């Protein structure tokens, strides 16, 4: 069973944003470029074939705690980036392919804000003793 761990730059909070579509496209392209460099620098190799089914765990390191809906909104760009269209780690980000094993976690780290994703091949459910 393959497990990949990504440390990505913190994506902007999109939940309450009302960006013009051009501004959002610019920010998204900028974030994708920065995130791609982070993945390359980490030494994670591309897979020969995208995962058909995967479970993701997300841990946010933030300035201050946020509502859960804001965390899910922040996951949009990173999960899109994992797909075959961009980086090719998962076939798609639809519920038939990608599931959450746990609610996104959040921790306070004001000096090093980031998003850590753990992508595991297959569908898993983490339980309290298995963290």
Q: Could you say what each language-model-derived stretch is?
A:
Residues 1-131:
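Catalytic phosphate/metal-binding cores of nucleic-acid and nucleotide-processing enzymes, i.e., regions
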């Amino acid at each position: 069973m393959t497990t990949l761990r990504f440390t990505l730059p913190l994506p902007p909070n999109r939940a309450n944003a009302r960006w013009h579509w051009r501004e959002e496209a610019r920010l998204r392209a900028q974030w994708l470029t920065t995130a791609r460099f982070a993945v390359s620098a980490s030494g994670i190799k591309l897979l020969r074939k995208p995962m058909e089914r995967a479970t993701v765990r997300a841990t946010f390191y933030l300035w201050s705690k946020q509502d859960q809906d804001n965390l899910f909104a922040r996951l949009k760009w990173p999960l899109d980036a994992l797909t075959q269209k961009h980086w090719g780690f998962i076939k798609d980000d639809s519920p038939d392919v990608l599931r959450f094993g746990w609610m996104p976690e959040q921790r306070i780290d004001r000096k090093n804000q980031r998003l850590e994703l753990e992508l595991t091949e297959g569908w898993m459910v983490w339980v309290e003793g298995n963290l």
